[in-house]
Amino acid sequence: MRWLWPLGVSLAVALAAGPERAPRGVWLQQGGHQPVAQEQPDRSRRGAEREDAKGLQQYVPEGWAEYPRPIRPAALQPTQPWVAASPSPDRARATGGSGQEPQGNVTGPPGQRPQVQNPLYPVTERSYGAYAVLLLALLLFAVGIVGSLAVMCIVWHSYYLKSAWNSVLASLALWDFLVLFFCLPVVTFHEITKQRLLGAVSCRAVPFVEVSSLGVTTFSLCALGIDRFHVATSTLPKARPIEPCPSILAKLAVIWVGSMTLAAPELLLWQLVREPSPAAGTVDTCIMKPSAHLPESLYSLVLTYQNARMWWSFGCYFCLPVLFTVTCQLVTWRVRGTPGRKPESRPGPQEPRGARPSSTVAGLAAVHALCALPENVCNVVAAYLSAALTRQTLELLGLVTQFSTFFKAALTPLLLLCVSRPLGRAFLDCCCCCCGEGCGEGCGGRAAPAGPRAKLHTELSASGYFHKPREAPPLLALGTPC
């Protein structure tokens, strides 16, 4: 019985320690001397992981991560790109579970909302420049919008002015209207407040519309020069055949599609960058930088366009229309001055003399050259002397480049109304009718002649611009009833 005393001692110790201090997994076999350790089944909640299997990155319920997350050398390095975490899990669940909102191609200090600055009040040194830019923008906007709408409405409502020539002029007026209506407010707002309207969308859309407008002007000048040369060298009789409407639409489609295709790389070239500023808080800047997420072939194409963009614009949008117009004018004058050459057919009453003068093409080319020259000079200076220039100088060069395009868009329809006699006459008649003076009275202080002959002349001139003829015209109409 001596072997029973160790058993009694162990039982006494176990009872004295209690069930809380008894070692887990220690069980006594009735027929043995040594304890055998058995594994207890894990009583943790089903689906829960062990603490040692979890990652090193722990989340505190009330301490949400900031953007960007700080990288600690001792912690686990993140393998996913930084994501802006939402301030609460409910908001993250409402936005789709991730809490990430699309930011486009915006880079800069995150988590900081852009603050719109108002330099107009209170008046400071910067206010004078802001007021000058605002007044100039308002003047260009008013003149350009009124002129563009006038040209488009006259060509659209006039029966005898719906020709290929006038349709090209109306196309120019339409693109000038788009540039002034969409691009001018965005550029002016950015210059005053240093914030970009519509963000990255306007950063890409504004250059695309401006370059497309340059392409439309270039191809339109080439088309007008060719048309003027055909008119000068044509041997057709005075009553020319009517040009069908599909032919006019095909010419306009070639001009528009070609211009927009050449301007398509602008949509992939520009990106919006937000930089911190001690004065304005955040400054939006549009830079030429292709996105790294583009395919390899497309990225190389856009990069090639970026490297050749300056000289491509100078050659295609400045040299080509100017040289082409000058060449066509010289050849036309040479042909018209040839001895034995019959003069051009005299236009009829429905198309007054000067409907297609050479001065219209020459004036359009001169305005385009004068407005595009400062833009190209600023681009060359900014490209080759950017290291020696200050930031303020570069911003001034960019502003001159933008407003050169706006000057061209505002002056082109005004030139058409002043140089083209049918457009100018129709505009004056429309102004007289709107002022309540009546189309029968003379405009500009001229007295209307009395008599039935003068009345017939007035009716013919008015119906030729705004209404379809009630009876068959004495000559074949030169316009196309589209």
Swiss-Prot record:
GO biological process: adenylate cyclase-inhibiting G protein-coupled receptor signaling pathway; negative regulation of systemic arterial blood pressure; positive regulation of MAPK cascade
Mitochondrion among keywords: no
Positions bearing Phosphothreonine: 480
A GO molecular function held by the record: G protein-coupled receptor activity
Primary gene name: GPR37L1
TM annotation in the entry: 135-155, 168-188, 206-226, 252-272, 311-331, 362-382, 399-419
Quaternary structure, from the entry: Interacts with the PTCH1 receptor.
UniProt keywords, alphabetically: Cell membrane, Cell projection, Disulfide bond, G-protein coupled receptor, Glycoprotein, Membrane, Phosphoprotein, Receptor, Signal, Transducer, Transmembrane, Transmembrane helix, Ubl conjugation
Disordered, as annotated region: 25-56, 78-119, 338-358
Localization in the cell: Cell membrane; Cell projection, Cilium membrane
Signal peptide span: 1-25
Ranges per topology, Extracellular: 26-134, 189-205, 273-310, 383-398
Name of this chain's protein: G-protein coupled receptor 37-like 1
Similarity annotation: Belongs to the G-protein coupled receptor 1 family.
Residue ranges, Cytoplasmic side: 156-167, 227-251, 332-361, 420-482
Bias (Basic and acidic residues) ranges: 40-54
Any Pfam family the entry gives: 7tm_1
Free-text domain note: The N-terminal region is required for constitutive signal transduction.
UniProt membrane topology term: Multi-pass membrane protein
Organism expressing this protein natively: Bos taurus
Listed InterPro entries: GPCR_Rhodpsn, GPCR_Rhodpsn_7TM, GPR37_orph
Gene Ontology CC: one annotated term: plasma membrane
Disulfide bonds: 203-286
SUPFAM superfamilies listed in its UniProt record: Family A G protein-coupled receptor-like (SSF81321)
